Amino acid sequence: MSSKRLRLIKSCILSLTLLVGISNALGDPPSKKVTLLLDWYPEAENAGYFYALTHGLYARAGLEVRISPIGPNASVEPQVALGKYDFGLGSSDQVLIARSRGVPLVMVMGSLQHDPVGVMVHDGSPVHTFADLEGRTVAAQPGLPWILYVAKKYQLRNIRIIPLSFDYAPFLRDPNYIQQCFITSEPPIMEHIGVKVRTLWVKDSGCDAYMALESSDRFVAAHPDVVRAFVAASIAGWRGYLADPASTDSEILRRNPAMSAIQLELSRKVLLEYHLVEGPGIAPGSLDPERMRNQYKILRTLDIIHADYDYRIAFTTRFISQP
């Protein structure tokens, strides 16, 4: 039997196993059209949802799911809060901030266990720690909580933030260039093309956000069975993607021509190496209330959240059923 045929058989068995697991967990699933708004274009960081879609996990759960991308200058949270989309991807800090401003969003699952955001420098850069960013210019998205946190923790009084171009060219041209990155994206690509880099992962500074699967209060209250079915299928999708990414990668490449197969492969390796989806004692989709409390305290200390509120309304664990 050829190795290609053997891989195909293994893929079919894995899909059937996941389908049976969801069926047993959910019983008779609801029939519902569901929309999901990504926080970027299709990529490895949202591949679990595409696995669930392409392998029929959503369909088996009674859900007809449409997944839409979003560009760099648009926001997920308002569109989900207003009901334009049933679910969206974002970050737990943004959900906490939105709730503090009266936006009725709720986090229903940890899409990734850690936000992969970081700072990338050339290997020859004198920047080795966050404290070394003092007096330097960093290309980043202005106003993000992690920037304010790092600046306060490391007493960065003279750090200059310039807009991130979402383009590799400035970094490749300038050996002193410093930019925001995703550890799953830019650093492995740079290494692949022969550019040596180092990365400071924001998580290691103590600012440890989740990547969030979020919905609106209204949708969760009106369709709890749909939320439960979508979360269960999405968790199964993440397990499936980590085990067998091939067909899902093909769908991502079809939807995002700017993506490459090698980039997907490199990003998936980082997802596994850094336990971004699951890790020792941590299952896909998990949410830790204590981590959410700590994150709320950070945002409150930074005065990004201006007044106290019950942070527990910003998330729920009731839809996360682990085997």
Residue ranges and their predicted role:
Residues 2-13:
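Bacterial N-terminal signal peptides that target proteins for export
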Residues 11-21:
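Bacterial N-terminal signal peptides
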Residues 20-30:
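Bacterial Sec-dependent signal peptides at the C-terminal "C-region" and cleavage site
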Residues 28-181:
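Short, glycine-/small- and polar/acidic-enriched structural segments
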Residues 52-55, 61, 79, 83, ...:
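Structured segments of extracytoplasmic/periplasmic soluble domains
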Residues 93, 164-260:
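Pocket-lining segment of extracytoplasmic ligand-binding domains
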Residues 222-304:
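Secondary-structure end/capping motifs
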Residues 292-323:
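Conserved C-terminal helix/tail region of periplasmic/extracytoplasmic solute-binding proteins
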